[in-house]
From Swiss-Prot:
There is a cross-link at K428, K654 (Glycyl lysine isopeptide (Lys-Gly) (interchain with G-Cter in SUMO2)). GO terms for biological process: chiasma assembly; DNA replication; double-strand break repair via homologous recombination; larval development; positive regulation of brood size; positive regulation of DNA recombination; positive regulation of embryonic development; positive regulation of reciprocal meiotic recombination. This is RecQ-mediated genome instability protein 1 homolog. It is found in: Nucleus; Chromosome; Nucleus, Nucleoplasm. The keyword DNA repair applies. Essential component of the RMI complex, a complex that plays an important role in the processing of homologous recombination intermediates to limit DNA crossover formation in cells. Component of the BTR double Holliday Junction dissolution complex, which is involved in homologous recombination during meiotic double strand break repair in the germline. Promotes top-3 binding to double Holliday junctions (DHJ) and hence stimulates top-3-mediated dissolution. GO terms for cellular component: chromosome; nuclear body; nucleoplasm; nucleus; RecQ family helicase-topoisomerase III complex. SMART domains: DUF1767 (SM01161). GO terms for molecular function: DNA binding. Its main location: nucleus. Expressed in the germline (at protein level). Component of the RMI complex, containing at least top-3, rmh-1 and rmh-2. Component of the BTR double Holliday Junction dissolution complex composed of at least him-6, top-3, rmh-1 and rmif-2, which is involved in double strand break repair in the germline. Interacts with rmif-2; the interaction is direct and is required for mutual stability and localization at nuclear foci. May interact with him-6; the interaction is required for mutual stability and localization at nuclear foci. May interact with top-3. Transmembrane segments: none annotated.
């Protein structure tokens, strides 16, 4: 083929996304021309290109193709847009376990004909029929199972000739049977590549086909290598066992041969009895000879020469010798065996010839060589006597040593140790007070070891074996201090100035007194009352809030005839005894007749009531409420409805004090008011605000004694009559007329949304005695559990789900895990606007609204006070109040809160948070 035709073929294949190598293409075209011969003239270029593609599918991609781009296999996220051709290296089904695939590949049906004793044709007809039925059922079950079972996901190993990467089949794109090594696939669309893995589906790839014979692989070997399982382990084990058995047999044969060769020069009997020469066959029997001659006279020639035994002398210097006094166990000297003596005798036989040289005659007889036991005992006795003498003479341990038996005559002096039984070891005695002769035991009455102060009736002591008696633990017990009363340091006390009445000469000067503000629980009021007796002049609680002035430079005295008197403090200590009797009884705070008299006392405001102009000049911070113990005691009684119990303590005339004005001094004005009311019908005493018959009383709810701060007596449907306006003072009418403007419909709806419903079920816990957190006694645990149960804490999610079954709104107690503020604090000019997200264990991020009354109690000021500051351009004070409000709102982030939430049965209404407390305050724990 000419170069022009080859270039045209190369460009045509490139348009088909086959970027072949030019050299491989030329060789491939030459091979095709040689195969076709003369028919090549009738073949078009496109037909030649198709033949080249078929030849490429059966060739290695590394030899024929140039990769269009280098794929970054280490990239985390890549999208391949170009069309690329890859070659399959291997494929694995990752939908099933590799072990299951390996077991299927290695499974084979064993022929058990040898076990049955013949082929299946020899069986009876019944058995053949049964076997056919079972085989057919098994075949049908297998076919059904194979038909139902779907092929799983394939993991394919691919290469583009340079890079090797893996592909995961998301859909059933390829057939597992045709995924042979060397097959080619092409990418047709956008393919995602994640960490070197291509994600393939039907829309982005196609199968081209092909196969390379040289790239075939064994699937069983692939699975076994992946699982690291050696399938030939049993064969290798059998081969190794056979080799070991053959080696052991060869070793045994070699041992037997060696043993046989060694026994050629030995007799089967004892060599001492018979000696046989295997070479010549001669047998020699040695002559029996006695070891020791029995004759009384021994000839010198008949005595064998005994070689001298050389005793090795120690070569180490004396400094390295072991002079320890410990006994080293030694085995007795072994006696030489009899055959050793016999060998010596045989080595030196008796000689009868006189011409032989004679050995030197023995100096003693043989009988004298026998060791006598008596002589040994005598020698040992002498040795012991010498040792004792040496020990008595020496006095230092360093001077004595033990020498061997042959050198006792040269031994040094040895220190003696007296082991007499009469001598006793001296024991160091400690002082008597440091010694406890016996362990802890129960002392008896009259024990001299006890002090005179501790001698008492021992039977009273509670004895424990582990700790001892109570009298030993008295010093460790300390009386717990009562921490319910806290004395405030003077640095935290605010100094205020009270204005005294000019009529009293003693109180004309300004009196510097301290108004103590005490937070937390109150107890021991009597102690505080004794401390407060030093105050010279008692003023009314609210006197220091408002200062009555006639002009800016001088003080004016009120028209009161008598100075105000301090009402008696309610003694809470007496009420603690009988609180249990009145646990379910809640009395109203005051009678209605007293309230009417108080309203009458405010009728004439010209003399006693301070004008609004003078009120503006009063330097008074309404956000700070200062109270004394007296005031807080009465507030606590009013809060829990215990005002009625002090009827036997507080006199009637002292109850008629309203803001420092005595009702008894306004009799004339009451008479004028009564005379003006003569022309009008008198109201009923039972219902003073109505001239109509009394309507029926709404019965209280079942849980009305649990209402807490929201407690009120049973409601009455009271119709307000026209006579009420005459009771209200004129200044209050004026203020009300100016402040109360008729809002529009939208303002009324917003106002109703931000207030509690009139008909609502409330769940509250009864008043309980405050517990001390430092008390760890087990008696308080049941009380805490009971109080926790009385709180009736519910999951917020249950309340929101079950409210569709309610007929009215309910107040539920929830324990949030976290609360987060949605927006900044806002106001519409009347109420506060604040929404928070509440999350507990049952629900997450529920939007709730916080009531205005709760925010007023938390902040200490309301919206109206902020408006007044804004109108007066007091920006700094307004900014300070805003910062204080934001700081106090951080308390919603606490993790120990309890929320009282009003939940409406309507789903479109947001839950309203009415109260918030910590768990310790809710359980009344100090």
């Amino acid at each position: 083929m000419k170069e022009t035709e080859l270039d045209r073929l190369f460009s045509w294949l490139a348009r088909k996304h086959y970027p072949f190598k030019r050299e491989w293409l030329r060789i491939c075209v030459q091979y095709i021309e040689g195969s076709l011969g003369q028919r090549i003239k009738t073949v078009d270029v496109k037909q030649i290109g198709e033949l080249v593609i078929q030849q490429f599918l059966n060739s290695k991609i590394s030899e024929a193709l140039d990769p269009t781009m280098k794929i970054p296999t280490s990239a985390v996220k890549v999208v391949i847009v170009k069309r690329m051709i890859f070659q399959v290296i291997s494929s694995t089904n990752i939908s099933t376990s590799l072990y299951e695939q390996l077991s299927e590949c290695t499974r084979h049906n064993e022929d058990l004909a040898w076990f049955h004793g013949g082929s299946k044709a020899d069986h009876e007809e019944e058995n053949r029929d049964k076997e056919k039925d079972v085989a057919s059922d098994r075949m049908n079950h297998t076919q059904t199972k194979n038909a139902i079972k779907k092929r799983g996901m394939l993991k394919i190993e691919l290469t583009d000739g340079v890079n090797t990467l893996k592909a995961i089949e998301l859909d059933e794109v390829f057939d597992e049977k045709i995924m042979l090594p060397g097959a080619k696939i092409i990418l047709t669309g956008k393919v995602k590549c994640r960490r070197g893995n291509l994600l393939l589906d039907k829309s982005n790839c196609a199968f081209l086909g092909g196969r390379v014979e040289s790239l075939s692989f064994d699937k069983v070997a692939q699975l076994s290598n992946a699982l690291k399982v050696d399938l030939d382990a049993e064969k290798k084990r059998r081969k190794a066992s056979l080799e070991n058995a053959a080696a052991s047999v060869s070793r045994n044969n070699k041992k037997q041969i060696d043993k046989k060769n060694l026994s050629l020069n030995q007799s089967s009997l004892s060599p001492f009895l018979v000696k046989t020469s295997r070479i010549t066959g001669e047998v020699t029997v040695p002559v029996k000879q006695s070891l020791v001659p029995t004759a009384s006279r021994i000839l010198p020639s008949s005595v064998a020469v005994i070689p001298s035994i050389q005793i090795e002398k120690p070569t180490d210097p004396i400094e390295n010798w072991d002079f320890s006094i410990e006994e080293v166990p030694q085995e007795p000297t072994p006696e030489p065996p009899s055959h050793h003596v016999r060998g010596l005798v045989e080595h030196y036989p008796l000689r009868s010839k006189p011409q032989d040289p004679l050995p030197p005659p023995p100096t003693k007889r043989l009988s004298s060589l026998i060791i006598d036991k008596n002589s040994i005992s005598k020698v040992s006795q002498n040795i012991s006597n010498q040792v004792e003498k040496g020990l008595l003479q020496n006095k230092t341990i360093e001077d004595w040593t033990f020498n061997s038996t042959n050198s006792f005559d040269k031994s040094k002096k040895v220190m003696s140790i007296d082991n007499s039984k009469d001598q006793k070891m001296k024991i160091k005695e400690l002082p008597g007070q440091l010694i406890r002769p016996t362990p802890i035991e129960k002392p008896i009455i009259g024990d001299p070891r006890m002090n005179s102060e501790k001698r008492k009736d021992v039977s009273v002591w509670v004895w424990e074996d582990r700790k001892g008696s109570e009298e030993e633990d008295i010093a460790a017990k300390r009386i717990k201090k009562i921490d319910s009363v806290m004395e405030i340091p003077l640095c935290f006390v605010k100094e205020t100035t009270r204005q005294a009445n000019r009529s009293n000469e003693e109180s004309r000067h300004k009196l510097n007194t301290f108004a103590q503000t005490i937070h937390g629980p109150r107890s021991k009021i009597d102690d505080f009352r004794v401390k407060s007796n030093n105050v010279p002049v008692f003023k009314q609680i609210t006197d220091h809030f408002i200062t009555v002035k006639s002009n800016p430079n001088s003080f004016t005295s009120s028209t009161r005839h008598t100075p105000p008197q301090m009402p008696k403090v309610v003694d809470f200590g007496n009420f603690e005894d009988y609180d249990e009797d009145y646990e379910d009884e809640v009395l109203p705070t005051s009678s209605f007749r007293d309230q009417l008299k108080q309203r009458k006392s405010l009728d004439n405001h010209g003399e006693d009531v301070v004008l609004e102009e003078e009120m503006d000049h009063v330097d008074h911070d309404e956000s700070i409420i200062e109270c004394t113990m007296d005031h807080e005691g009465r507030l606590e009684c009013e809060r829990w409805g215990l005002r009625g119990r002090e009827s036997n303590i507080i006199e009637d005339d002292k109850r008629n004090v309203y803001n420092g004005y005595n009702m008894n001094n306004n009799i004339e004005r009451d008479n004028k008011y009564d005379s003006s009311m003569n022309g009008m019908p008198q109201p009923n005493l039972q219902h003073p605000l109505s001239i109509l018959p009394p309507p029926p009383v709404i019965p209280p709810s079942q849980n009305w004694n649990y209402t807490g701060y929201y407690q009120a007596p049973p409601l009455r449907n009271v119709i307000k009559s026209e006579t009420v306006d005459s009771v209200v003072p004129e200044d209050q009418k004026m203020v009300g007329a100016q402040g109360k403007k008729r809002p529009n419909v939208r303002q009324e709806n917003d106002n109703m949304k931000n207030k509690q419903s009139a008909n609502v079920q409330v769940y509250r816990t009864p008043f309980a005695e405050r517990l001390n957190s430092g008390d760890s006694s087990s008696k308080l645990s049941p009380q805490l559990f009971q109080r926790m149960a009385d709180l009736q804490i519910v999951p917020f999610g249950d309340a929101l789900f079950n409210r569709k079954f309610w007929m009215m709104s309910k107040i539920v107690v929830i324990m949030p895990s976290i609360c987060s503020q949605i927006h900044e604090l806002q106001s519409d000019g009347i109420d506060w606007l604040l929404q928070i997200r509440v999350t507990d264990t049952s629900v997450k991020n529920v939007i709730c609204r916080v009531s205005t009354s709760l925010l007023n109690r938390i902040f200490g000021f309301d919206v109206q006070q902020c408006k007044n500051l804004f109108n007066k351009n007091q920006v700094e004070e307004l900014r300070a109040k805003k910062c204080e409000a934001e700081r106090k709102l951080l308390g919603f982030k606490r993790l120990d809160l309890l929320l009282w939430v009003e939940v409406s049965p309507e789903r479109n209404q947001i839950p309203l948070i009415l109260d918030v407390k910590t768990i310790s305050d809710a359980l009344n724990i100090l």
